[in-house]
Amino acid sequence: NLFQFTKMINGKLGAFAVLNYISTGCYCGWGGQGTPKDATDRCCFVHDCCYGRVKGCNPKLAIYSYSFQKGNIVCGKNNGCLRDICECDRVAANCFHQNKNTYNRNYRFLSSSRCRQTSEQC
């Protein structure tokens, strides 16, 4: 769920790091359209696509099991859609971490008018 995803992001990037990803680029935050602006925005695009493939539960609300082991996010013994949601969130949190050095503050709170290009397909 979104609370667990927040904890994953903060666990990988530090306390309150999630605040940098709430409204960044064209895809980080609610909804999304256009072309991802940078690697961070691409992480969000891929995460949105991943959630779109989940069947059988609501990715934003369903509670799954996971833990941090030696700094790595490990999804627990979840079944079906819970496993899929955990994997979506784990991959995105790792993606943010891998691209933290290219995070661009200029894309925070980006106007939707800058995201009007034809949206990419998942």
Curated annotation (Swiss-Prot):
One of its GO terms (biological process) is arachidonate secretion. It catalyses: a 1,2-diacyl-sn-glycero-3-phosphocholine + H2O = a 1-acyl-sn-glycero-3-phosphocholine + a fatty acid + H(+). Expressed by the venom gland. Gene3D superfamilies: Phospholipase A2 domain. Its cofactor is Ca(2+). Its main location: secreted. Keywords: Blood coagulation cascade inhibiting toxin, Calcium, Disulfide bond, Hemostasis impairing toxin, Hydrolase, Lipid degradation, Lipid metabolism, Metal-binding, Neurotoxin, Presynaptic neurotoxin, Secreted, Toxin. It is found in: Secreted. Disulfide bonds join C26-C115, C28-C44, C43-C95, C49-C122, C50-C88, C57-C81, C75-C86. GO terms for cellular component: extracellular region. InterPro entries: PLipase_A2, PLipase_A2_Asp_AS, PLipase_A2_dom, PLipase_A2_dom_sf, PLipase_A2_His_AS. The active site is at H47, D89. Binds 1 Ca(2+) ion. Ca(2+) binds at Y27, G29, G31, D48. Its EC number is 3.1.1.4. It comes from the Eukaryota. Belongs to the phospholipase A2 family. Group I subfamily. D49 sub-subfamily. Heterodimer of an acidic subunit (CbIalpha or CbIbeta) and a basic subunit (CbII). The acidic subunit is non-toxic, and increases the toxicity of the basic subunit. This is Basic phospholipase A2 CbII.
